[in-house]
């Protein structure tokens, strides 16, 4: 749905946009790390698609799927890659901050609260701050405004600390409640 909405701003093939959106995460069946590559292979292996799309279109869709990862260092190779990459990320400050705390607690359980906070701040700076590796490709997307809101929050040390403390408390107590 988001890909189709973003595609309205460009002269693109809507069937290609829809197909890319449908296939871009199918590779998650083999894990997250290389899912973008696996998803492209799944698309390319679908014989039915070859009946509806040209060789060039199939290659362009495969590349768009491969390029959609937020952590990619290079820009997507086509507007199709930019559309799916942008549509795939939903920047919501509250969700982003909560997931960052959750990730730290699940992957680094040995860290105390202060080290978790340092990791939290570093991740936010590396990915979301000005100059961070997260890039938005479609200026008309809803993400642009939400990223600006998140960046403003990140620069407010007092406020971000309060948010972290609250999320840390909530996320730390949940496993204890589940074990009752």
Label the predicted regions.
Residues 1-16, 38, 43-51:
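Alpha-helical phosphate/pyrophosphate-handling elements in metalloenzyme active cores
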Residues 1-12, 23, 72-180:
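Divalent metal-dependent phosphate-bond-processing catalytic cores, especially two-metal-ion Mg2+/Mn2+ enzymes
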Residues 4, 16, 58-61, 111:
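Detector for methionine-enriched segments
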Residues 5, 9, 29-32, 45, ...:
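Amphipathic alpha-helical interaction surfaces
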Residues 13-31, 35-39, 60-70:
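His-Asp-centered metal-binding catalytic motifs of divalent-metal-dependent phosphohydrolases/nucleases
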Residues 37-79:
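Helix-adjacent hinge/juxtasegments
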